Structures are given as C-alpha cells and as structure tokens.
Amino acid sequence: MSGIGPDQALSIAAIATAVAPGQGGIAVIRLSGPSAVRAVAAITVIPGQQVWESHRVLYGHVVAAGGVERLDEVLVLVMLAPRSFTGEDVVEIHCHGGVIAVQQVLARVLEQPGVRRALPGEFSQRAVLNGRLDLTRAEAIGDLVGARSQRAAQLAMAGLDGGIQKKMVVLRERLLDQLSELEARVDFEEDLPPLNGEALLQELQAVRLELLTLVADGERGSVVRHGLRVALVGRPNVGKSSLLNLLSRRERAIVTDLPGTTRDLLESEIVLDGVPITLLDTAGIRATSNAVEKLGIARSRDALASADLVLLLFDLAQGWSDDDQALFALIPEGVPCLRVGNKADLPLKAEPVAETVAASVADVRLSAVTGDGEQALVQAVLERCGALGEQPLLLALNQRQSDLAVTAAEALARSEQVAADGLPWDFWTIDLRQAIRSLGEITGEQLTESVLDRIFSRFCIGK
C-alpha cells in the first residue's frame, strides 16, 4: 500500500519521547512531511558551514520569533525522503529534557506554515501509507512500546522483524495459486488437463489448519501481551498478604496475626514466566459492622467480577470450612478459580474428616511463608489461563489479525463444503476470494484509511 492522502500535504510534528516534569536528559521533537526541513531551518541558527544533507547531524540553537532569543541548544538530525521511517522528509530536533524548553521548541515548530500537531500513531500510519512498513510491522511497534515483560517484547520484535507479514504472504500466495487453477478451469477447462480436486482440497484444508493454529497462538499471546488480573480471596488471616509478598518479593501488604488486617484492595504488578500479572489482594470477606472494612469487602467483590482468575486461599491446617465453601460460591460463574491450600508447613489442627476434605479440595498446596509449592502454583495459574502450550510461542497475532484469520478460515471451510457438495469450480472461488481478501487485510494490502485511522488511534503520539 502506498500513496499520499489529502492531509499528507501537511507536515506533522510531535514530541517523540516521554517527558515527565523535571525529568529526562534529552527530548526529541519529530517532524515528517514536505515542510519539515523548511520549518526547522526557519527556527534554528546553525553556525559555520554545516550542510543540510540527509542523515547528517547539525548543531545549533532554536530561537524565538525575531531570531534573537535562544530557546535551547539542540542537535538536528535530517533524514530526507525516501530514506526515512515514514518515507517522507523527517527531521528530529534533539533538545534538553524537562518540560518548558521542550514545549517552547514544539510551539515554535507548530507556528510554521504547513505544520500541524501529529495525531496518535500518525508517523507509523504514514509509513504504512507510503509503503515503508506493512501493517503488521507497524502494529508491532505499538506492541513493543507497550510491552510489560521481556517475553511480550520478544513477541513484538518477531512481528517487527516481519514474522507475521511473511507468514501471511506465504499463506495468501498458496491460496492465490489454487484460485488461479480454479479460474483457469472455469474459463478454459477444455484446453487444460483435468484438475486434481482432491489435492486442491487438501491444500485448502492445510492452510485453514495453519490459520487456526495461529489463532490459538494469538490467544496465548494475548495473555503475554495484556497480562492477567488475579484476585487473591480467602477468609481473614489465611495468608493472602503473605502469598502476595512471596510472589512480588517485597512487603506490599501488612502481615500480622490479627485477622482482617488488610482492609483495602492492594495491587502488585509481577511477571510470572513472561506473563504480566496484576495481583489483587482483597480484604477478607466476612460479616462486619466496621464501615472501613465494609468498603474493602465491597471492593473485594468487584475484584472477583473483574478478575481473569481467582486464587481462593484456605488454611490447610484448619481444613476446608463452611466459610470457605461460602466464599467459593461467591465467585462469579465463568471466572476460573484455583483453590489453594496454604500453611502446608504447619501441623494439622483439623478433625480427620475436615483434613481429608481439604486434601481433596486443594488444587495446589503450598506454604506462603517458606515458599514450598510456589512453582506448582505458578504453573497452575499459567495453565488455567491458557498461557502454556505444547510448542514455544514464536509468533502471536493481535485481536484484529486473529479476527481476520478466523474469517479466512471460515471462508475456507465453506469452500471445502462446496467441494464436498460437488458444486462447479466457480462456486469454489467465491469463498476462496474472501479468504484471500482477509489475509490481505492482515498485512494492510486491502484496507481503507478509515480502518487505518482506527488502528493507529491506539498508538501514542510521536510514534
């Protein structure tokens, strides 16, 4: 896909680095478009005989209107079309970090004719429109920026390196080969040897199965990319806060022997085997007249409803109680739950019957104090949430890509049914064309600008 949209006659500008008040040694202001070089040249004083050539770094100052007052000392990096990220003239102004100087420089840039503030993701969108990136690579940039774990970053890099695009091109070409065979038979059947319908059908089935495998991997990748919300639930003083501290490796919760110490919803961000996890340590749910504790319990119920997984802790030493069963009944239908028997290091105090019930109920046994059973819990969490698989996860489609892959697979299934029904060749081609179109949409070969606008609106400004 390439071409210039009506708004690409204007240059765009934005701060391309995250700037926090008083922080950051260097900030980068990026411009792209036909006016980029002229706009920066108009607001800078570049001493000596420095030449505005592509892929050169110039030293100078950004000056206020009037050309006298210096606003900042800067480096200017020039990248002329087509050898730039967007395929247009790109200029970066590297100025001092912070807030005031950066905003002053950006304001001067935006004062120049033909320059406007960039929309979220617009630099990447122009790269796609100008044929510098396919859509899967552009989306991978957003995934890399937002990666919350090393594993998520690795999956993003696989997409940025073209893994998804190359896979889709190969699958699409295989379908195009079959379509050309079918269409040739429709138009020139009497001049060609008989078509091997069985071989063609096997090829369609093979592509469909590959697409479904990619969709399944995409579901695993979604867990890695977006993470999980895991709620820790249990009676007061069963060890929820101790487990939170064990998994997060720091004292996030107040741990005492006083039941009901946690009265608020505590959150801890951790990474388990490459999967970002938000642990929600809830207040113990019980009947109470304390107004503060009631608020914490209400938040606990909300956490149950929003969680991807619930860890229901109970005291192995005390056994599975009626209160534990009542808590189990509060977990919303459809929310996965692991019943975790804690305090496995303590001597049993329960009656033999309660002890037997506890042993049979527990999905995982551990001691949050000693750490015994921690790895078994981690594996159980990842398995229950679909983050584990038989094969290593090398590529992961995002939701948009997965939806289109499903559409393509469904179209191929219909094509296979048409073949099974013995209908003529031209009926085979209808759904086959739909599958080919869907794969083209994944890489951006067949997309409207309105769809691109929606995709890139999720990006941060400056990317």
Swiss-Prot record:
Q: Sorted alphabetically, which PROSITE patterns does this protein's record hold?
A: G_TRME
InterPro entries with a match to the protein in the record: G_TrmE, GTP-bd, GTP-bd_TrmE_N, GTPase_MnmE, MnmE_dom2, MnmE_helical, P-loop_NTPase, Small_GTP-bd
* Presence of the UniProt keyword Chloroplast in the record: no
- Using the UniProt record, give the first listed, main subcellular location: cytoplasm
Per UniProt, Mg(2+) binds at: S241, T262
* Cofactor notes: Binds 1 potassium ion per subunit.
Q: How does it assemble?
A: Homodimer. Heterotetramer of two MnmE and two MnmG subunits.
Q: What is this protein called?
A: tRNA modification GTPase MnmE
Organism of this sequence: Synechococcus sp. (strain CC9311)
